[in-house]
Amino acid sequence: MRGVIEDLDRRRAEAAAGGGPRRVAAQHAKGKLTARERIELLLDPGSFEEYDTFVEHRSVDFGMETSKVPGDGVVTGWGTVNGRAVVVFSKDFTVFGGSLSETHAGKITKVQDLAMKIRAPIIGIFDAGGARIQEGVAALGGYGEVFRRNAEASGVIPQISVIMGPCAGGDVYSPAMTDFIVMVRDTSYMFVTGPDVVKTVTNESVTAEDLGGARVHTTKSSIADMAFDDDVEALLQVRRLVDFLPANNTAGVPEWPSFDEVERREEALDTLVPENPNTPYDIKELVAKVVDEGDLFEIQAAFARNIVTGFARIGGRTVGVVANQPLVLAGVLDSDASRKAARFVRFCDCFEIPILTLVDVPGFLPGTAQEYGGLIKHGAKLLFAYSQATVPMVTVITRKAFGGAYDVMASKHVGADVNYAWPSAQIAVMGAKGAVEIIFRSDIGDADKIAERTRDYESRFLSPFVAAERGYIDEVIRPRSTRRRVARAFAMLRSKAAAKPWRKHDNIPL
């Protein structure tokens, strides 16, 4: 028996060595951890259960039959994050550059199936060069199997992709179909075709960083949801993200102990909104005063900064936060902000995460660039997302809620359950100045008359009590009481039941 156990230990040590000391050293020299080191950091100590440790590829072309490493370039299994089960796979760049073979794909699909079976989140760590070209179409078939499972798991279990090195070619499409993409600055890249191919085909010279680095994908393409400085920070933040998420679409939001009293009143909120309606303020100050311990985990913080999206807790339970940001473009909705918020709202609705919407929106951004870029359809995405959502939704209007943007931002008309407004709220088709200049165009040359008519319009149409009189606002509240009101509303809505007509699926305006 001793000999058998010694053989097992030898085989495990061989698998754990990956591509060998030289390649591991090269990985560390780039500031990157190995596949196994990443899993150890991501999961609770001692919780990782590895599967398919000894799987090897079956390729016999191009001399591959003499080049085999146990595990075949990906480490798979399951473990826990703060005691909650998660499934994980981590591509090993030290073995065949982490490239995907038929058996490599089989290991991934096996744990994808496991995640669906136990209804637990799955986290994929990517550091690879794409398909293993020695296997040809077999590798492509493997990709297809992975992609199909990504689609089947969507909306059933949370899927998180962590890009910690190159992610090119077919490898990019699996992360693109997951719920969240995390990148590491300076060491991670995502692109369909790399700089060399771009140069050959288009004669365009571009670096890997400028083509598909973390900065590009967090600020321009919106492919990535967040980026961090190194592997350690990224994995610790993924652990934090997992803590906010339900295990699956029927598990309910996680609840953590909170020592932040839900009855807490914040006097500072009574003076948060400036007297001048054109003076900006930071909506994150309001978020910090309303949620537990001021803790907001932002999603896509560097993209479309005129709207804020992220996870927080109220009364220890996860909520999704969507908030216009007056500090950036006055909080206006544009194509990027609409897409960003729509995707976030859809995710929350998939996983029964209640949504808190904080509104200060002067309308949609005008201009040819927006219209040519499809603002109508992008704005409709957010409208569609809110209209289809069945989770508890609470809305607070702090200042402006003008035009179609008022409807879009979780108004009572599109299905929000509880709608509050601060006394500073202005709810109308447009601001007083613009409205008066249209209605009383003939008086534009008379400054005194325009000023008088503007004051009259403000008193008659911009007051939140006009909307409250019609039941569009459930209550006009003191700003200091916002946390208490919101917390009690969400507690009341826990038993919410909502029915939608049967359909195979909806047809969101993509």
Where do the model's predicted regions map?
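Ligand-binding clefts of soluble mixed alpha/beta catalytic domains
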Residues: 1-510
